[in-house]
Amino acid sequence: MLTITSYFGFLLAALTITSALFIGLTKIRLI
């Protein structure tokens, strides 16, 4: 249970970081 929870937490964190980086690059290109 704890392993699955930590795994999904890590996956969610990775997805959030990836989205943040993608949005940042998009804003830099728009400027």
Curated annotation (Swiss-Prot):
Annotated Gene Ontology cellular components are: chloroplast thylakoid membrane; cytochrome b6f complex
GO BP term, example? photosynthesis
Residues that span the membrane, as ranges: 4-24
Entries under Pfam families matching the protein: PetL
Where does the record say this protein resides? Answer: Plastid, Chloroplast thylakoid membrane
Q: What is its main location?
A: plastid
Report membrane topology.
Single-pass membrane protein
**Recorded GO MF terms:** electron transporter, transferring electrons within cytochrome b6/f complex of photosystem II activity
Q: What role does it play?
A: Component of the cytochrome b6-f complex, which mediates electron transfer between photosystem II (PSII) and photosystem I (PSI), cyclic electron flow around PSI, and state transitions. PetL is important for photoautotrophic growth as well as for electron transfer efficiency and stability of the cytochrome b6-f complex.
Q: How does it assemble?
A: The 4 large subunits of the cytochrome b6-f complex are cytochrome b6, subunit IV (17 kDa polypeptide, PetD), cytochrome f and the Rieske protein, while the 4 small subunits are PetG, PetL, PetM and PetN. The complex functions as a dimer.
Name of protein? Cytochrome b6-f complex subunit 6
Name of the encoding gene: petL
